[in-house]
Amino acid sequence: MKLKHIVLGLALTTLLGVIFSNQEVSASSTSSKVVKVGVMTFSDTEKARWDKIEKLVGDKAKIKFTEFTDYTQPNQATANKDVDINAFQHYNFLENWNKENKKNLIPLEKTYLAPIRIYSEKVKSLKKLKKGATIAIPNDATNGSRALYVLQSAGLIKLNVSGKKVATVANITSNKKDINIQELDASQTPRALKDVDVAIINNTYIEQANLKPSDAIFVEKSDKNSKQWINIIAGRKNWKKQKNAKAIQAILDAYHTDEVKKVIKDTSADIPQW
């Protein structure tokens, strides 16, 4: 009788061991598929593309979103391992953030370009712009530089800098139409439309002027000078060694599909970069 109890006890111990072992394997398998993604508070367009990505990854990854309200937060959360990857910024922002915070987050994949545009209430084409016309651009270093590169891309000026180098009006080497560049706070450029011939307005502020991206008379081109403004998915330098690396890769692969490209084109004025 005592022997039976011992045998039964050993059998139960073995059975429980198998159960707990299976549970641990299952939990480990699940955790290796969980990817925490840091984003800014979802806009309808961002939500639409991520909804599609979630469907495409299927059971290869389980995405958990953390929404932030401050642009300083997602990168810090990624560096602190509170999230695995983030999707909210362009190359330029990440590079500057790394320098300022002495971190080494890296771009994992490019996503889209949110081009800035030239608007006008006075002309329907830049070809109609008269000599001596006034153009309003943002006055901060980042957006002002980007605006000048757009003017160069439009054929209105030439600069003696390119790529990542910050451009100022002092870098203008050719201005055949003698355009007058008026530098204003970015938030004031929509109001300036009534007083200037054309204005370069950030996407953030076009609604203030009751404008739509389709109203633009010129759109920033995707070239070597605009590369720094391409949005990206960013993560930690050693992300490929993380236990959820395959799940992260599945998300990157899902983003770069024709299905997501279609969602971006159907729901926004952004330009996919693949």
Label every PLM stretch briefly:
Residues M1-A27:
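Sec-dependent N-terminal signal peptides of Gram-positive bacterial secreted proteins and lipoproteins
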Residues F42, T69-Y71, K81, I85-E95, ...:
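Beta->alpha turn/N-cap motifs
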Residues A141-A167, Q249-W274:
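Ligand-binding clefts/hinges and TM-proximal coupling segments of bilobed small-molecule sensing domains
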Residues P115-L126, W229-N244:
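A bilobed periplasmic-binding-protein/Venus flytrap-type ligand-binding module shared by bacterial periplasmic
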Residues L108-I157:
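A conserved helix-loop-strand patch within extracytoplasmic ligand-binding domains
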Residues N96-L108, K122-V123, D195, I200, ...:
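Ligand-binding "clamshell"
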Residues V34, M40-K64, Q73, A77:
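Short, polar/charged alpha-helical segment
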Residues F65-Q76, K164-R191:
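Short helix-initiation/N-cap motifs at beta->coil->alpha
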